[in-house]
UniProtKB/Swiss-Prot annotation:
A motif (D-box) lies at residues 379-390. InterPro entries: Cdc20/Fizzy (IPR033010), WD40/YVTN_repeat-like_dom_sf (IPR015943), WD40_repeat_dom_sf (IPR036322), WD40_rpt (IPR001680). One of its GO terms (molecular function) is ubiquitin ligase activator activity. WD repeats lie at residues 110-148, 149-187, 193-233, 235-276, 277-320, 345-379, 380-420. One of its GO terms (biological process) is positive regulation of anaphase-promoting complex-dependent catabolic process. GO terms for cellular component: anaphase-promoting complex; cytoplasm. Controls wing pigmentation patterning, possibly by regulating scale cell development. Probably acts as an activator of the anaphase promoting complex/cyclosome (APC/C) that promotes the ubiquitin ligase activity and substrate specificity of the APC/C. It is found in: Cytoplasm. It comes from the Eukaryota. Keywords: Cytoplasm, Repeat, WD repeat. Pfam families: WD40. It comes from Biston betularia. This is Protein cortex.
Length: 441
């Protein structure tokens, strides 16, 4: 090859086109590159659990992975100091939520003032309390196994952590029944001569003591060895829910149509902290994996639902998020003990919905991610007032306003043998075991 040919190659070769007025593509920031295609996508302003929204979100995640772009963080609101903070969770990879073709009848449940008359023991026994009677139904044998009776109407019921004893809240008193459905312990509320009703109950994680809340706003810490450990009038009106934390250190309390959540020390019932919201508290639940991580469901005055995640021992660690863009009420919220996922029962408050019965079950892994859902394009499911998980977390029992007890498949069955059951151990639990709930911290 001569000098002339090499010169011609140099003259014909194209130089890289560099324009000092146009920034090369590789130097553009990531957010700018993302906006070139994300702005062209039609924004969906519907519910975050709808199939259209989930399909669009999967498509955006696919584009992020294809172009090697990091997902954008949500816009931080002024009220959200912990915008990236969320509850611990091991979310599912695909949808499992479906009905298990088990529907039982709950007569007179629709007129029950307090809905928590359903529970599931560690022996796979479902109990439903109706009036003065309660009925036990075995999931293993798919048949009723026993029934019991109380002197007064039952307002709430709860199995102890081992599933051997059943705690029943009735008018003026609580009863503890054994495995044979026989009453072995009775304790009256400390409202003296005033007539009240036990509206909320919960066992401590060790099963040595329990807490009760009544219609006059009194909360009592009790055990089966002696009279109530401590009694306290906390609010005016009926108690909605009382929940003892997994480490047996706190008890969370909320009243009916109240705007406050109280955190008391357990079992001495000393006021520790409280959270005041501008919304009505509908339900609350402790996360099973944390020592004290509380989820709170609320309903605003304009009938918009929201949820709050709060660590009571960390005063400033709190995050609130609206649920849905429509008018929904959260009737119940539960954390799954196997995956840590949050399950919400939503009821549409819009009178203009095309279907008269519009209820949603939404499974969330964080504040803006729905991993499973039931309710879209389905009709006929009335308001779900309460729900409870099976001991292994794979099944779900719900009680509706149509007086139906429905069993759901929540997770696939785990057929592997669990050689050692994991337990949450802490010093407060040790003290609670040794002292039968008398420990004063």
């Amino acid at each position: 090859m001569g000098v002339g040919s090499s010169l011609r190659m140099q003259l014909t070769a194209q130089k890289p086109r560099v324009d000092r007025f146009v920034v090369p593509r590789y130097s553009l920031p990531e957010i700018h590159r993302r906006m070139t295609w994300s702005d062209r996508c039609e924004k969906y302003n519907g519910e975050i659990w709808s199939s259209k929204y989930l399909q669009q979100k999967r498509y955006i995640n696919f584009l992020d992975e294809a172009f090697g772009l990091a997902p954008l963080k949500a816009q931080q609101r002024n009220s959200d100091t912990f915008d990236d903070w969320c509850w611990p969770c091991a979310p599912r990879k695909k949808s499992y939520l479906s009905t298990a073709d088990n529907v039982l009848d709950l007569p007179s449940y629709s007129i029950t003032s307090f809905p928590d008359v359903l529970d599931w023991s560690h022996d796979d026994i479902l109990v439903a309390a109706l009036g003065k009677k309660y009925h036990k139904w075995s999931w293993r044998t798919q048949s009723p196994v026993d029934q019991g009776q109380t002197m007064f109407d039952i307002r709430c019921c709860k199995f102890d952590p081992k599933g051997k004893r059943l705690l029943l809240g009735t008018d003026m008193r609580v009863e503890v029944h054994n495995e044979l459905s026989k009453c072995q312990f009775v304790q009256y509320c400390k409202c003296n001569i005033q007539i009240c009703t036990i509206t909320a109950i919960d066992w401590s994680p060790t099963g040595n003591s329990f807490v009760t809340g009544c219609s006059r706003g009194r909360i009592c810490a009790m055990n089966e060895k002696d009279f109530p450990i401590k009694s306290l009038v906390l609010i005016e009106g009926a108690m909605l829910v009382v929940k003892i934390s997994p480490n047996a250190r706190y008890v969370a309390v909320a009243g009916v149509h109240k705007h406050r959540v109280w955190i008391l020390s357990w079992p001495d019932l000393i006021r520790f902290r409280f959270m005041k919201t501008n919304e009505i508290v509908k339900d609350l639940n402790w996360h099973p994996w944390q020592t004290a991580l509380l989820g709170v469901a609320t309903l605003s005055s304009d009938r918009h639902a929201s949820m709050i995640i709060w660590e009571p021992h960390a005063t400033d660690k709190l995050r609130q998020q609206d649920v849905g863009r429509g008018r929904y009420s959260i009737d119940a919220m539960r954390f799954n003990n196997k995956t840590g996922e949050l399950l919400l029962s939503l009821w549409s408050l819009d009178v203009n919905v095309p279907y008269p019965k519009s209820s949603e079950l939404v499974v969330m892994s964080n504040f803006d991610t729905v991993v499973d859902h039931w309710g879209e394009s389905h009709t006929g499911l009335n308001r779900i007032r309460t729900m409870v998980f099976s001991p292994d977390g794979t099944k779900l029992a719900t009680a509706t306003a149509d007086e139906d007890l429905i069993i759901w498949n929540f997770l696939p069955n785990d057929y592997k043998k669990i050689l050692a059951r994991k337990k949450f151990t802490a010093f407060p639990q040790f003290l609670d075991i040794c002292s039968y709930g008398y420990t004063i911290r």
